[in-house]
A protein has these predicted regions:
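Generic structural signal for well-ordered alpha-helices
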Residues: 1-4, 32-36, 76-81, 109, ...
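Catalytic domains of carbohydrate-active enzymes, especially glycoside hydrolases
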Residues: 33-49
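N-terminal amphipathic alpha-helix/helix-capping segment at the start of soluble metabolic enzymes
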Residues: 1-17, 84
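Hydrophobic faces of well-ordered beta-strands that scaffold small-molecule active sites
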Residues: 13-21, 44-48, 91-95, 120-122
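Glycine-rich anion/phosphate-binding loops
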Residues: 26-32, 97-114
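Alpha-helix-loop-beta-strand connector modules within alpha/beta enzyme cores
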Residues: 9, 60-93, 141-148
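Glycine-rich, proline-tolerant flexible connector loops at the mouths of alpha/beta enzymes
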Residues: 22, 44-74, 127-139
């Protein structure tokens, strides 16, 4: 069901919550443990935040540094699908247009459609930390409305 319809048709205040994907190396079970504790409150939907990659500096064997682009957390696509399939609660993954290239955004939307995740929250994302989108603006959407 579409979250907008759940909100529109609700006779009382609806409860929802937001999940921060676990750091890489953790399993989906960490997310399930949180949801298991909160599902008694009958959430109408669950938001899944999304975090863009960030640059870190890796020390090379010769003592020099290399700038590396890494993601510390899994994306919201897989987590949204896992939550929706396990619990039957609509999932709302966040898609940040400044954190992903236009192609990455398109692929995420194709995957979400394929997985039956129909609710999205599309955001611009933080500008100050997104060096890549500033260096290659033609590859990124400037605003969420550009994703349409």
């Amino acid at each position: 069901m579409k979250v907008i319809d759940l909100i529109r048709n609700s006779k009382s205040t609806a409860f929802s919550f937001e999940i921060l994907p676990p750091l890489k190396g953790n399993s989906i079970q960490k997310v399930y443990n949180v949801i298991d504790k909160l599902k008694e409150f009958d959430p109408k939907y669950i938001n899944i935040t999304s975090h863009h990659s960030e640059f870190v500096y890796k020390t090379l064997p010769d003592g020099s540094f290399q700038k590396v682009n890494i993601r510390k957390r899994p994306g919201s696509v897989a987590i949204a699908s896992a939550i929706q399939n396990k619990y039957g609660i609509p999932a709302v993954p966040h898609i940040i247009c400044k954190g992903f290239t236009k192609d990455e955004t398109e692929y995420a939307l194709i995957d979400l459609n394929f997985l039956g995740v129909n609710n999205l929250l599309i955001l611009r994302g933080d500008i100050k930390t997104l060096e890549a989108s500033q260096q290659n603006p033609e590859l990124y959407h400037d605003h969420a409305t550009d994703s349409q």
